[in-house]
Amino acid sequence: MSSPTLSPPPSPSPWMDSPSDPPVRRTSRTRSVWVIGGSILTALALIFGALQAASALATDTRTTDQSFDAGEINAIEISVDNGAVVIDGREGADQIRVQSRIREGLTSTDFSLRVTNGRLVIRGECGWLSEWCESRVNVIAPPNVPVVVTSDNDDITVRRMRGGVDLTTENGDIAVGRLSQRVRLQSENGDIIAKQLAASTLRAGTENGTVSLVFSSPPGRVDATSENGDVELVLPDTPEAYRLSTNTDNGAVDDSIRTDPSSNRTINMSSGNGDLTVRYPS
């Protein structure tokens, strides 16, 4: 009686786990990590939302109205983190009036006014969790007082000032009118609009925005630049000629004014991406 023939054992399936395959428990651990990470993110989102809601509920607004003897002030300096600033020159004013509107949320807005060595210094600073922080400032002053204004996030407006004017904003427009003497206007992200200028020297520049300058009297020197935007100058139609320099990487140039390379009146215009126009009133 012959022995039965035994078939060889079947070959391992290619789909079966090999000894080198990672244990199944690692998949569970990975899933746990994702669950924990998602839970943390959800908790953070809930905390952030709760803080925003608490900040909104805690929002408060207050106003101030203060006056200072103009004879004791030789300059005005304003610096605000968030908030529009307006300065208006008034003939015959013997007081400098400062009106402010201060808004705060979960944390207080640090707002202060003080006189230091003849300089009226106004500050509006935002702290942590200061989503609702804002310091709006309106000033009425004699026209001959020099002003320096810095705002991180909002517009600046100055009118009818004959002293030196220096304005800077990170994110906001600058609008001025009827200024004279030396003027500097600078914005990182915003337009610069100036009208009825009698400034002897003016520098205006923006990273992203339009520069538009309209003069009521011939300037001595103008430097106007925009990295991304058009630049336009409108000059009074008088016999004066100008030493003109224009430069744009991507844009057209229209320079329909009287020019003279030996003139002591200088205009420099440039734009990275934008048109340059210098003309007389139409």
Regions found by a protein language model. Name each.
Residues 1-33:
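Terminal targeting segments of Actinobacterial cell-envelope proteins
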Residues 3-4, 54-119, 136-140, 146, ...:
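Short linear S-[DN]-x-LW-Φ motif typified by the pepsin-like aspartic protease active-site region
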Residues 30-53:
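Hydrophobic membrane-insertion alpha-helices, especially the h-region
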Residues 80-82, 91, 115-117, 151, ...:
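A generic beta-sheet turn/junction motif
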Residues 86, 97, 119-121, 157, ...:
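General beta-strand recognition
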Residues 93-95, 105, 128-129, 220, ...:
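Short, surface-exposed beta-strand-loop junctions and turns on beta-sheet-rich folds
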Residues 119-208:
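Non-cytosolic head/periplasmic domains of membrane-anchored proteins
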Residues 183, 194-282:
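Short, surface-exposed interaction patches in beta-rich subdomains
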